[in-house]
Amino acid sequence: MSRRTYGNTLLLWLKLICCMVKDNSKLFLLVLLGMLTAFGPFVTDMYLPSLPAMGDYFQTASSMVQLGLTTSMIGLAAGQILFGPLSDRYGRRIPLLAAMWLFIVSTILCLFARDIHQFVAFRLVQGIAGAGGIVIARSVAADKYSGKELAKMLAVIGAINGVAPVVAPIIGGVFTEAIGWQGIFGILLGLGVVLLVGSYCFRESLPKEHRSVSRWGDTFRS
């Protein structure tokens, strides 16, 4: 196959991808929502094989390093309480962009943490940001689909959510020996950038007239 043929094929695929992104096609939404669903488990679990190496790096006990897992899971739970009402009030796109930016910044801070205490604190923020993807993915599915289509989309999201916690440590284990724990967080950073780009391409799915006007106090009282 000639270079010209390769070039034409690549150009055709790029045009196809651009059309899917521009129109927010079903395939684009499936990929985006699937990645957002897997985002939280990857944030919490992908670095697990790196725990011993991180203990040596920060010169601390393994129990202290494991606090990073605990705080990220706390953040994952707290973030759902935060991003759920935000996405109902301000739409899906703005909170999603905020979550992605928050994740990117917190991941960079994790990479440059000077001690284990800073790292644990930044992991909490990472978990909060990761929760945004899980909550908003389900909300977008409910906005865009109904009936059997919604059931199929939620089934796919549920399957991904079940598989991701198993796959994430395996992927982390494969890469840990080659690139170290910083490399694992570099992969997470790259994933965050990809999702940020996808979030900018995403069109708002919740019209203003359907948004909630309730106050934060009402949310917690309910």
Feature locations, PLM:
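Helix-loop-helix hairpin linking two adjacent transmembrane segments in secondary transporters
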Residues: 118, 155-200
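Cytoplasmic helix-loop-helix junction between adjacent transmembrane helices
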Residues: 124-160
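Juxtamembrane intracellular "pre-TM" segments in multi-pass secondary transporters
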Residues: 21, 207-222
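Conserved MFS/SLC helix-loop-helix module at the cytosolic interface between two early adjacent transmembrane helices
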Residues: 78-116
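Residue-level signature of mid-helix packing/kink "hotspots" within the transmembrane helices
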Residues: 45, 73-81, 165-166
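Short hydrophobic/alpha-helical segments at membrane-entry points of transmembrane helices
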Residues: 117-123
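Extracytoplasmic
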Residues: 28-62
